[in-house]
């Protein structure tokens, strides 16, 4: 199935070039580099940045990283006689309002992940619009290609959004720790009670 999805991504890029589309904005996934989360949760790494080698330990993430790398080949123009396609890859975090409601107080790493991955609706809209409308997305080598993490301005972030702020002016307005303060307090109280008793 994932091989079919990679072929589909190729067809999307190729069709964009053939039809004269200037830019493809692709919803990738944080799973394109999800292997690094193992290092984060074992305290061997603090942040994942979009410029790190995309490493995944599963087929889904592998397919997403393959879309991204294929997009880079199209952005260079190397696969279409010099016809470059601008490509933005959006590694979306957790665009759900329910993750904390389902959190297990005995798994605080999962709670941390839910808080760090959160992407509010209004931040997602801004993120996508700016990815489409920003005039110049060229990287430091002049290639019109970017990978951005899509998360809100969360205190618990473990994916860097610095390049999205710099390149497209992404300015997220929401913070999961503030938005879900009541839910977080209840989870932490439950975890404390479970660990130390009432």
Region spans (language model):
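Hydrophobic positions on the long internal alpha-helix
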Residues: 8, 12-16, 70-71, 127, ...
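Conserved Rossmann-fold NAD(P)-dependent oxidoreductase catalytic core, especially the SDR/UDP-sugar
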Residues: 10-57
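Flexible, glycine-rich beta-alpha linker
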Residues: 32-34, 59, 76, 80-110
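Glycine-rich NAD(P)-binding loop of the Rossmann-fold in SDR/ketoreductase-type enzymes
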Residues: 3-11, 19, 62-63, 119
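Catalytic helix-loop patch of NAD(P)-dependent Rossmann-fold dehydrogenases
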Residues: 3, 37-83
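Conserved C-terminal active-site "lid" loop/helix of NAD(P)H-dependent oxidoreductases
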Residues: 105, 144-171, 187-196
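Alpha-helical substrate-binding/gating segment
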Residues: 79, 94-108, 118-144, 153
């Amino acid at each position: 199935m994932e091989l079919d999805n990679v072929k589909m991504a190729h067809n999307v890029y190729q069709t964009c070039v053939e039809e004269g589309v200037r830019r493809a904005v692709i919803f990738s996934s944080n799973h394109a580099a999800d292997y690094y989360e193992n290092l984060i949760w074992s305290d061997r790494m603090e942040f994942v940045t979009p410029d790190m080698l995309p490493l995944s330990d599963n087929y889904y993430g592998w397919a997403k990283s393959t879309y991204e790398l294929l997009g880079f080949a199209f952005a260079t123009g190397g696969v279409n006689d010099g016809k470059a396609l601008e490509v933005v890859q959006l590694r979306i975090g957790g665009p759900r309002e329910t993750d904390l409601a389902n959190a297990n107080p005995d798994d605080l790493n999962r709670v941390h992940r839910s808080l760090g991955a959160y992407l509010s609706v209004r931040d997602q809209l801004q993120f996508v619009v700016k990815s489409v409308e920003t005039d110049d997305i060229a990287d430091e080598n002049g290639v019109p290609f970017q990978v951005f993490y899509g998360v809100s301005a969360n205190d618990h972030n473990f994916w860097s959004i610095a390049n999205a702020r710099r390149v497209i002016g992404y300015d997220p307005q929401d913070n999961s720790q503030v938005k879900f303060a009541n839910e977080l307090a209840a989870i932490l109280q439950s975890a404390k009670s479970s660990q130390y008793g009432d």
